[in-house]
Amino acid sequence: IAPIFWSKGLSWNTTDEAALKDAEAMVETLAKHIKTFNSYPVQDVASGSVILAQCWNGNARQAIDSSKNENLVFVYPEPKSELWLDSYHIPAGAKSLKAAHSWINYVLDPAVAAKETTYTGFLSPVAGIEAHLDPKVAADPLIFPPADAIKRGERTERNETYDRRVAILTKFKAAAAQ
């Protein structure tokens, strides 16, 4: 639902009641034009079963690389886009703390992170990764977004409207392709 807010010049973390009501109404209109919500759209994009997809940059790269369609392109949205990151967490009470720390230390090694980035197509925040990357991979804007794309990124805030925004998105997903 973030693009609804961004198209109106608002943050997707808005607390404006009128904007939230407007988004709720808008999802009813938009839902009939949405084929699916798919967290891993690589096959749908690569096969051509969808003509437009919103997906993570690494998934877009995988779809483009595996498709026979030479016209597939990825763009970083404007005026805003979601700034996303994955993180590792060790659950409280975990019995294998040593193994968990070993795994995290392993994947934070620049050489290992470079292999993971090359394979998945997702950017790694590990310092020193560049020295371990093929220059073609290091220059790929699908992996390493341009500075202006990162600057346009907006993080999700867990503010007082977070649950409401999640509910609007859930309603949107439920109404899609009906």
Question: Language-model features: where?
Answer:
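Non-transmembrane alpha-helical segments in soluble domains
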Residues: 2-5, 24, 42, 46, ...
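Mature extracytoplasmic/periplasmic domains
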Residues: 91-150
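Solvent-exposed loop/turn segments at secondary-structure junctions
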Residues: 1, 58-61, 79-82, 95, ...
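Conserved C-terminal helix/tail region of periplasmic/extracytoplasmic solute-binding proteins
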Residues: 43, 146-178
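Ligand-binding pocket segment of bilobal, Venus flytrap-like solute-binding proteins
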Residues: 2-77
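Short beta-strand->loop
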Residues: 70-82, 91-94
